[in-house]
């Protein structure tokens, strides 16, 4: 029987191997969506990822003979420990062939890392922060992945459960029908709610007009989710990074902002056209030709993804979503959108799930993080 050898990623050559491993593993899987290689590389650069300023991280590759058969990253988020009192090793970027010797060796590496730092718990898959991809797929293996969700084969959860890991957090995802005509009560309520609470939908003529609202959006995101047990506030440095990286290419028609009579933001939603098929065609590289597929996906698409939604706690359950959906419908009516897919939502987050009730929600994916208490 061949031994599994674990090696730490110590140079860029090995980092490229680390990034490309799942692309090879899932090369014949029509539902896997590869990331952009340069974006993945930037995750591990301090100048590109502000979370590295308060986190420790290592990456490892698993080998059998000279062949790569698995990978894992381990992370300690010191901000999480200091602000929430949560002391754990996060593990992520977990991929492996269907061989329990490989998955065992990878998890043992995470345990070893935790023990070296006197930490008694590991949890994953997850990234550095709440805005990173998290959760191992447990339902929906036959559904096309999104650019904001992890994908894995059905054997992954079985491997972790056989190793003694247990469910920590559960996420659900929904597919919503984007109606040709909004439900009558939504049309009616949107006007009534706007009038009652003196709310308005902000109109943007260009991307430049959106930028002053980016920071308020993230602050509102904190207000929306701060009651959740695992939520850590977004730092100003993270906001700056996300603003520079993403808001430059998001179509203004996919951003909806609702403000009160004092022009204070009370709700927002960011949707994006599905870039899954464009990413599959890109095969990890945007240039020289793949940018064209992204351009086309933005112009005409039958599917969009809810990327972020934030509603101030004072306005949750007050019908503000009717204003948001009416605005989204108006903005996207000529883009061919038929389905909206939500991002992963914690199962416990009923305040967000109730938002979809008027749009025939289908729970088509589930995912979870697994944890293990480490014995001394």
Question: Over which residues does each language-model region extend?
Answer:
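Generic, well-ordered alpha-helical scaffold segments in large soluble proteins
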Residues: 21, 109, 113, 220-224, ...
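Acyl-donor binding region in acyl/amide transferases
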Residues: 83-164, 282-358
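Short beta-strand segments
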Residues: 123, 175, 257, 270, ...
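Catalytic cores of nucleotide-enabled group-transfer and carboxylate-activating enzymes in metabolic
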Residues: 12-15, 34-46, 53-62, 67-74, ...
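A structural motif corresponding to the C-terminal lobe/cap of the Radical SAM core domain
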Residues: 358, 362-369, 373
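A conserved beta-strand-loop-helix scaffold within acyl/acetyltransferase catalytic domains
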Residues: 22-64, 72-82, 203-204, 208-309
